[in-house]
Amino acid sequence: TKVIKYEDDSKIYKTNDEQTYIDKNLIDKNGDGYNFCKVKVRTLRKPVIGDKFSSRHGQKGTIGNIIPECDMPFTENGVKPDIIINPHAIPSRMTIAQLKETVLGKVLLYLGYFGDGTSFGDFEVKDICKMLQDIGFESNSNEILYNGMTGEQLESNIFIGPVFYQRLKHMVNDKQHS
């Protein structure tokens, strides 16, 4: 048996118009003594309509529309949301901790600190809301947004803040049969 010394020679391959990176190579023997090789690859993809995302609290959803950044609503400070979710999704899935993460994340973002936004943290919601008021926001984290296409003020205040979302494996490009 010839032994080949592995040298990390990560490469980029183009397959199906996608850049694919080789992260790891593993050459080993199984329990029966046969050689095997494992290759871990990763592909960079832009989100498309139908891709599935989830917050840390299990608030799942799929992309229903992709709007150019210039057309997204914006705050008085010029902050534009990356995603807009249906507010009815929070009570129906009972992901109330996501609201706590959003408000705490907004406070910590403006103060420049890190924090624990989980339900196991020692922050009380009323304390977080007080801190939000102290830095100049409404205690319920609502803000006035303006229409990105017309510049007009939206009719209602919008609950806005940072939340960590991650893409799930359910991607449209993997499910299409073309």
Where are the model-predicted features located?
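Intrinsically disordered, low-complexity regulatory segments
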Residues: T1-S178
